[in-house]
């Protein structure tokens, strides 16, 4: 399937008046960082347990910054598989009295609402998922969308930006904690494997790599 099928949505050419710099930077796509914590590796059968998303903003000089975080603990869908090893790895306690999980539909609807608001504010037409090993997060997001028959999914269905790849290029590191350390981003291993924490650190890493590229002369906005 070709990305060209989605180009008409972006309206990247021929629009009247100046476009928002963010829309210009990524051809009408808005980067949104997403991380999920799950009950296993299979997006079709394993539970989505946490999801977080960070929208990305751009300052007047064209530098990116993490803007707003959305986070939900999620109730496993009916019949979902949850591997004990996954719970041990993430430290998630499903029966914790303060977990306060919501349904997949509620979590996704809230995040999509926030993303659409950011799209409008930045003059973008579609979000593109940014993740550390992004195909994993996009797979679980798409599976939740399909299970709940959600309409108006703002994310591109198959394209993404992978910070594991970007960090490998920029710093020679593909593990999130090590990439953050190389980028002088504080990383507390005790907080890792929380969707909120990992998403916020991934957002810092993504913004840092893109901004570093700009500082090196790799991209100039249309006002330069």
Curated annotation (Swiss-Prot):
Keywords: Exonuclease, Hydrolase, Magnesium, Metal-binding, Nuclease, tRNA processing. Residues 1-22 are annotated as: Disordered. Disulfide bonds: none annotated. One of its GO terms (biological process) is DNA replication proofreading. Residues 32-206 form the Exonuclease domain. Its EC number is 3.1.13.-. CDD domains: RNaseT (cd06134). It is an enzyme of class 3 (hydrolase). The record marks 41, 89, 136, 158 as: Important for substrate binding and specificity. Mg(2+) 2 binds at residues 35, 37, 193, 198. GO terms for molecular function: 3'-5' exonuclease activity; magnesium ion binding; nucleic acid binding; RNA exonuclease activity, producing 5'-phosphomonoesters. Residues 1-11 have a biased composition (Acidic residues). SUPFAM superfamilies: Ribonuclease H-like (SSF53098). Homodimer. This is Ribonuclease T. It comes from Pseudomonas putida (strain ATCC 700007 / DSM 6899 / JCM 31910 / BCRC 17059 / LMG 24140 / F1).
